[in-house]
Amino acid sequence: LDVVHEDKTLPVLRNVMRNFYSPLKASDPYLQFVFLTGITKFSQLSIFSELNNLTNISMFPEFGGICGITKEEMLTQMKDYVERLAKANEWTYEEAVAELTQQYDGYHFTWPSPDIFNPFSLLNAFNVNRIENYWFSSGTPTYLIEMLRKFNVMPADIGNMQTLASDFDAPTENMASITPLLYQSGYVTIKDFDRPTLLYTLDIPNKEIRVGLMDSLLPNYVNMRKEAGNTTIAKMYRALYNDDLDEMFRLLQEYLLTVPYCDNANSEGHYQQMLYIIFSLFGRYVEVEVRTPRGRVDVVMKTGKALYLFELKLNKSAEAAMKQIDLKDYASKFALAGLPIVKVG
């Protein structure tokens, strides 16, 4: 994936793959079944021009659970491992299932589809009896960051997108958007399907991917040593968990002071995306530019205890931001959320 998008290396890569797969055609009389899979999709003509009898089963519902571990498989064939994980972390069995589901579940490769767990992360969690972000441990996805810049995609734009199958189950050789790369790399997955319009809803699969992805993107927005940054974020999360908003915002202010000077640093949008990333690292529900009848809320964050409405003002007072929240009555949109509403300017 690091080189598949480069004009110089793509023809070489394509030729190597063509030479590798071409002998299959000559071996046809001796082959009863051939299964091909990979991380990205090439146009069939560019690689498999001689193999004209392939069937792409990527989005066939009957094969929806073929690559991964379904929830049913985990609860039956891996029940002993779930119980062992629960005991090691002093959880009930139900709490362990909920933690595993939130962290590693959520993949769908067609619709309808069973819930699919990331097998690599799930098996690692069972091996050491700890729930952590294993999928990103191999390194930062530099190619993804480069593609996000190329297509001018903001962190908050990743996920919750509606698109046709032809726009994401498509070759990545000459992408017109970043959607095929996000889907085929596992950063977004199918979450819903609208049959009348044939539109699929794509979103980030689970907490592991959201937190790992945002952690990779954060250095592009702040100039802080990673160790110090992670420590500050952990302290912010603990303050939020303890309802100590004064401490959380003190830490947040300290964090924002690390933003280096750049062209984007003089725009509210830069800080909006930064807050989106930081709050996503908390593992919380967060949205930006949330529409209300009288305007848009810059950032909305939801926890188990409250709903936070953020209005951002650059080179203006916090009072001006709070005044706008009240003047445009942003809170009324969330009156039925069943949570206390906290306004932040």
Regions found by a protein language model. Give the residues of each.
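Hydrophobic/aromatic beta-strand patches that form the interior of the parallel beta-sheet core
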Residues: 35, 308-310, 342-344
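Nucleic-acid nuclease catalytic cores
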Residues: 318, 322, 331-345
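A short acidic/basic microdomain associated with nuclease active sites
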Residues: 278-292
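Conserved catalytic cores of phosphodiester-cleaving nucleases, focusing on short active-site segments
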Residues: 275, 297-314, 328
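Phosphate-binding site recognition
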Residues: 1-267, 282
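Short, well-ordered amphipathic alpha-helices
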Residues: 17-22, 325-332
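Short beta-strand or tight-loop elements
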Residues: 293-297, 339
